[in-house]
Amino acid sequence: MNPELFAETLSKYNFKLSPVQEQQFKTYFKELVRVNEHVNLTRITDEDEVYLKHFYDSVTPLLLWPEVFAEGAKLCDVGAGAGFPSLPIKILRPDLEVTIVDSLGKRLNFLSDLLEKLGIEGVNLVHGRAEDVGQNPDYREKFDLVTARAVARMSVLSEYCLPLAKVGGKFLALKGPRADEELEDAKSALEKLGGEVVFTRVITLPGSTEVRTLVLVDKVEATPGKYPRQAGTPNRKPL
């Protein structure tokens, strides 16, 4: 998917890229590849692949479920790495208030420099483990929408993300092709954490065989105070 096809595909979903937005994606690609030479951000560096597997993949929830992204909503992206999915979404929807949580300072340094080059405001970068941030009253149950892409299996991911979503908010997981198995394993975790799966959708990225599953979870009850557990525990002992 080259930049022109990317823009053309978005326009079919009523997202007409402005010249500024087109340039922001071009700069994002160039900076990603440049910094990736000395900081491990991604194994994908070919332009067509970055536009498909990073940029387009990140915005698919916004294209398919625009109603989930309310005007001015507060979005938290857990383990965003090089900014996926939240920054491509933010480029398309500058009104969103975005908080990015990541445990690696080098990645956050990249994002800080990138945001300056892109001229993007309204993004808060938080250095820390999701388990610790989820217990911090400044962030706990403060977000309308919490996103995560390819961070951990669903049972673990739920404990990272659901404590950050406010009651009535949503948790959106961007998963691979085998999400059904993960969801089965995560039933107990979701119940304990106050989440309820409302929708899953399997898609294939355009012009490829890349299968993705989007999982939308409603935060129906407050998360008990003991969750998330101590850093490292969710991964070692999933709920």
From Swiss-Prot:
<comment type="similarity">
    <text>Belongs to the methyltransferase superfamily. RNA methyltransferase RsmG family.</text>
</comment>
<feature type="binding site">
    <location>
        <position position="79"/>
    </location>
    <ligand>
        <name>S-adenosyl-L-methionine</name>
    </ligand>
</feature>
<keyword id="KW-0698">rRNA processing</keyword>
<dbReference type="GO" id="GO:0005829">
    <property type="term" value="C:cytosol"/>
</dbReference>
<feature type="binding site">
    <location>
        <position position="84"/>
    </location>
    <ligand>
        <name>S-adenosyl-L-methionine</name>
    </ligand>
</feature>
<keyword id="KW-0808">Transferase</keyword>
<protein>
    <recommendedName>
        <fullName>Ribosomal RNA small subunit methyltransferase G</fullName>
        <ecNumber>2.1.1.-</ecNumber>
    </recommendedName>
</protein>
<feature type="binding site">
    <location>
        <begin position="130"/>
        <end position="131"/>
    </location>
    <ligand>
        <name>S-adenosyl-L-methionine</name>
    </ligand>
</feature>
<dbReference type="InterPro" id="IPR003682">
    <property type="entry name" value="rRNA_ssu_MeTfrase_G"/>
</dbReference>
<dbReference type="InterPro" id="IPR029063">
    <property type="entry name" value="SAM-dependent_MTases_sf"/>
</dbReference>
<dbReference type="GO" id="GO:0070043">
    <property type="term" value="F:rRNA (guanine-N7-)-methyltransferase activity"/>
</dbReference>
<dbReference type="Pfam" id="PF02527">
    <property type="entry name" value="GidB"/>
</dbReference>
<keyword id="KW-0489">Methyltransferase</keyword>
<keyword id="KW-0963">Cytoplasm</keyword>
<feature type="binding site">
    <location>
        <position position="149"/>
    </location>
    <ligand>
        <name>S-adenosyl-L-methionine</name>
    </ligand>
</feature>
<comment type="function">
    <text>Specifically methylates the N7 position of a guanine in 16S rRNA.</text>
</comment>
<keyword id="KW-0949">S-adenosyl-L-methionine</keyword>
